[in-house]
Amino acid sequence: MQRQNTQAAGMPMMPQVPMVGNGVPYVVPIQPVFAPLPPDYRSLYKKLYGQGAFLVDNPVEASSPYDFSQPILKFGKLPIKQVLRDNESQQKDRKNLPRNQKSNEIQEKQTFQTPSSEKSTTERESRPFVPPNSQQMRRMLFIGNIPKELDDFWMDKILRLSGKLASWRRVADADNSMTSFGFAEFESNEQFSRALEALNDFVVPPLYEGGPSTRLSLITDVENEGLYREWQTSRYARNKQKEINILQQIRFNLERICQDIGNFDVRSRIERAARQAREKNEKLLQNVKTSEIPINAADLEGINPELLPVIEEEIRSFRDQSAMKKREKQRSKDEYASLYKEYTRKEQEKLRKQNDDLQNLLSKHRISRIPMSTVNAFLRAEDSIPESFSDEQAYYEEKRRKDQLEAEEYYARERRWMNREKARTAALEREAAREEEERVNNTSFGTYLSEKLASFDDDEEARVSRDEYFVDRAAWIRHRAVARAREEDADALDRKEEERELRTRGEGATVETENYVENGKLVTSEMPQHENGPFKIKIQTKKPAVPSERREFGLPERLLLEEEDEEPQGYSPNPQKPKPAMEENDAEKTKRLRSLIEKIPVEAESLWALPIDWSKVTEDLLKEEMQAFVTKKIIEYIGIQEDSLITFTIDHIRQHKGAEQLVSELDLALAEDAPEFVSKVYRYLHVLLILRSEA
């Protein structure tokens, strides 16, 4: 259904604005009407600015000597001609006055003011008409068909919701009653075009029950058509979604205003509050104390006396605007304080409600001494699942959250592990750097002592007395005693270390045995072999009182030969040891051990299937031999000393488990290196068992 625009009273006939049905969406742009203003529109400006306004057809020229844009001072109401006439006589008389009389006269002159009891007139009555410039005319919109019963407060609010309004002037008739049309000026071309788009189909609801609704008529100058087209092509085309959202918000606000206007009680209450606020502002403006600046006749030279009332009124308007801005600022502060108070009150109510819910939950389930974090997490978990979810959906949602929590915990553990490994690697690097620095320092100090002792001259040192021995013999003796005690302690430690090495002979043998375990080949010894070497006969009448607990081996490993190319023979875990009448020499013993070690299979499957005499795998062998070897190999494979893997491997051998099972257990940690690592460990175990059995 389309509504026709009703013609405003007292206005000339104008082309009708095309209507759009109510079913059209807001986002569809509506073609506005561009029509010329009435020929006699200038005569309407008198009604805008009062009966005393005058229309200036010719604007102020640019070459005018007066600059009205500068700050204007308020002048007192002096009789200009009388002041000019009396000024010359006063200057002549002042020459003959005493000094004190001159100062009194100056003081009286400074206190001269115009009476402030004059009643200020309103802007509509006294402010003269200022013709709009071309830019203002391009942003001006004629609005007609306004209901006369509608207060001007609502029109101002509607226009401000449509765009940034610069001014709104509603025409009044001779009886000072509002007419059905007015002029609205907007701040920018964009705001003007947006308001024209939003208000083109705006309908004022009925102001009383059973009354008709009225559609506003919008008329603007024909020249504004190019402005509107430019806005559509530039702003509306490039930022279409943004403009659509803005227009939707404007229309939504206008709908809310229409609801307030259509409700008589709400409209009356708002109009009454606005009228009271306006009367209060006018009363405050009347009570504002104006400070006037005294002037003399010289200040009035070059100013048209007829413009003094206009200048005074401009100053008054400036002061009124300043006072109004202060009141607006104070009102904004009060509103912010009230909003903040309301916000804090709501937050306190929310916390109080959460506390009540928590107390109800504790009393319902009889839960006591539960951490607040646990209860809050439970409440959040319950609130986060919508009530519309079915049991299956709630189950899958809880499962998804549980999986997400487990993933987060896994990543956290991985992060901690990475940080721990980085710290451990940095510590190892620092330790290696420290050892290298100590080695360099010791080497340098030894070189220094060697050079000093080589060129030391007792006679020369006694003569120059640079050494402590010649400077202070008693101090040198004390220091030497301390140094000697330190050296004796170090020598004792070195002797213990040498005894331990002699007992085990393990340093060189372990290296060569590990090379064989890794490469599957024996290492050639540099010690010469004699085909007809000497032999030693040892006659023993009885067994030693205390047999050695473990074999001291090392010589056979140093004499191992390279593995031959032929296939190794079968290996028995319990080889028969020959019992010659005379003790074997080192060469024969090494040859026999080499033949036994060569029989150990190299392939992984054959090596893993080889039986092990677990009765000879003692705790001493595991701790002193196997643990050191496993530790070294773990560091070679993963770069760090992982104690958990070392302990797991040793425990696996201690429990007499096979190699295949160890490979499956270490697959996650070592991946493709697990079979090679296990083969080296078990090959080394077989070598140790052979050496132990021959001890």
UniProtKB/Swiss-Prot annotation:
One of its GO terms (molecular function) is mRNA binding. GO terms for cellular component: cytosol; nucleus; U1 snRNP; U2-type prespliceosome. Component of the U1 snRNP particle, which recognizes and binds the 5'-splice site of pre-mRNA. Together with other non-snRNP factors, U1 snRNP forms the spliceosomal commitment complex, that targets pre-mRNA to the splicing pathway. Residues 85-134, 487-509, 540-590 are annotated as: Disordered. It comes from the Eukaryota. Residues 139-221 form the RRM domain. Gene3D superfamilies: 3.30.70.330, PWI domain. Its main location: cytoplasm. Keywords: Coiled coil, Cytoplasm, mRNA processing, mRNA splicing, Nucleus, Ribonucleoprotein, RNA-binding, Spliceosome. GO terms for biological process: mRNA 5'-splice site recognition. It is found in: Cytoplasm; Nucleus. SUPFAM superfamilies: RNA-binding domain, RBD. Residues 265-369 form a coiled coil. Residues 605-695 form the PWI domain. SMART domains: PWI. Pfam families: PWI (PF01480), RRM_1 (PF00076). Residues 85-96, 487-506, 548-561 have a biased composition (Basic and acidic residues). This is U1 snRNP-associated protein usp107. PANTHER family: RBM25 PROTEIN (PTHR18806), RNA-BINDING PROTEIN 25 (PTHR18806:SF4). InterPro entries: Nucleotide-bd_a/b_plait_sf, PWI_dom, RBD_domain_sf, RBM25, RBM25_RRM, RRM_dom. Residues 98-113 have a biased composition (Polar residues).
